[in-house]
Every structure is written in C-alpha cells, then in structure tokens.
Amino acid sequence: MMMNKIPEINRARGYFLYTADGKRYLDMALDGGRLIMGHRQKGYGQALKNAIDKGILPSFPSPYAHRLKQAVRSLFGAGCHVYLFKSEEHAKATLASHGLEYTLWRPLAFNTDTASSVTNACDPINDPINHKPSSNMDTQKSTATLELPVIPLLPVPAPFAPGVVVSKSELNIVEEQVSPVILAGAMRAVYNLKAFLAEVDYSCWEKAGITETCKGKWRVELPYLYPLCERNQYPAVWDAFFEAGIILSCDYDTPSVLSPDLSDGNRKKLLKLLAEC
C-alpha cells in the first residue's frame, strides 16, 4: 500500500511533514482532503485541551453539540437541519440504513455557495459552553442546494472527526451522543474553515498556468487535483511524486489538494512533476 511507504513523521507544519532525520514532504493528501487548511490550525489543539480539562471525555449530552450545529449552520444556512454521529462512517451507515442517498461536501469542490462571510460575533473562542451566539448571525444563506443530505468533510483529522449530516428538510434519523472533546475540536475547526474560505486565494495557481500544465493528466478543480491516468497506473504516479518529496492522495478516487501559499520554487517543482507524470 502507498501509505506504508511514508516514513515515520516527527512533526508537521503548514502543508509540510518532517521526519526525524530532517527530510521534508509536501503533503497533498492532507488526510483525505480534510486538512485543507494545513496542519496545526489555529486554536484547534487548545479547544481539545479546554474540553479535556473540564473532565467530560465520555459521550455525554453536552452544550458542545448545540454549538457545533450552530457552527455548521453558519456555513450551510440557519434553516438547515443538522444531525451528529460518532464518526463519518456512522453517519453514512445511518443514512444507508434508511435508504437515503447523500453528497460528500468538500470545501470549494463545487458551486454550492455555502461559505458565508466571517461573523466574529458567532465565534465562541474563549468560552464555548457559556457563549451566546449573536442574533446577527447570517440567516440569509440559502439551503436550496441541499437537494440531498450532505456529509461535510470536516477540517479535522479523521480519528477526531464526528459524523455530521446536513439536510434541507427534517430527516427521520436518530443522532448519536458524541464526546464533547471531539465536538469542541470540530466546532473550532468549522469556524476556522469559515474564516479560511472567506480569505483563501488560489489565483497563484491560475497565474502559473496549472490548467494547461495538467491538461490530459489531471483534472483541475482548484484546489483539488483528480488523476486522469488509469487506476492501475496511479501507484507509479504516486511513487514518482513521493521520490520527489511530495505525498499525493493514497486513494485514486480522492483528490490531492494544492497549497495556497507555496514558495515559487516549490510551485515550479510541483508544476514540472504534474506535467511529466
């Protein structure tokens, strides 16, 4: 397996991974695309620590469930219905057991126009439990695009990702209780994502001619890259990038993710590989 070729990682920063002996890898896999904002996002670790320090680690009912739902609605619209599960797999299994189809939502992957502007009054940084969201929260976001239930790919590592289902209409499904620690981290990450989507700029890749560079080899949907090679050819492509210090998605069907802030040198190196492989 491709994942087994990755050496022991000692630390991570931004979009790069570092081994104990100092070797650096550009991470374009980003945990299945979850870490679109890069590693070590602001406030995420502190949110986990704050919840742990309160001693409520088991999956008891807690105010964090409501707070996470509020965060999700700030992206998808105040009128949507939000359901929480222990994991993405539990969410998928629940929908499948009810014969419900769903869409996996990747930030910026298609034109759903779900990202609203940053509303700092809705961002419970200091005290998530006692925070009272502002009545000025953006309530104008349309949920018309939610024709199917949506499972958002939350910007947290998979082991720390609760399952979230977002629907335009009410669903006859039963939620699960989720650890407040998991919910607190996810809530912090969703607000981080909201700010990220309002500010991120991938135009550097357009200016560098990425679409023309990748023509016939990769489908470009900034910031995502989908391989156009045959499935059985993808491991060789992955190996070529890995030898050059770049880790692509380990799954053919899951896109690799471009960094919005690579140096000119790293961008040129990556473009050269994309044109060749």
Protein language model regions, located:
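Short loop-beta-helix segment that forms the pyridoxal 5′-phosphate
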Residues: R73-P107
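Conserved PLP-binding catalytic core of the aspartate aminotransferase-like
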Residues: W205-A240, S256-L262
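Active-site PLP attachment segment
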Residues: R106-Y191
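PLP-dependent enzyme catalytic core of the Aspartate aminotransferase-like
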Residues: A240-C277
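Glycine-rich phosphate-binding segment of PLP-dependent enzymes
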Residues: Y25-L26, L30-P63, Q70-F76, C80
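Active-site-adjacent loop/helix segments that line or gate small-molecule/cofactor pockets in enzymes
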Residues: M1-F16, D31, I36, A51, ...
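Structural signature of PLP-dependent enzymes
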Residues: I173-E212, E230
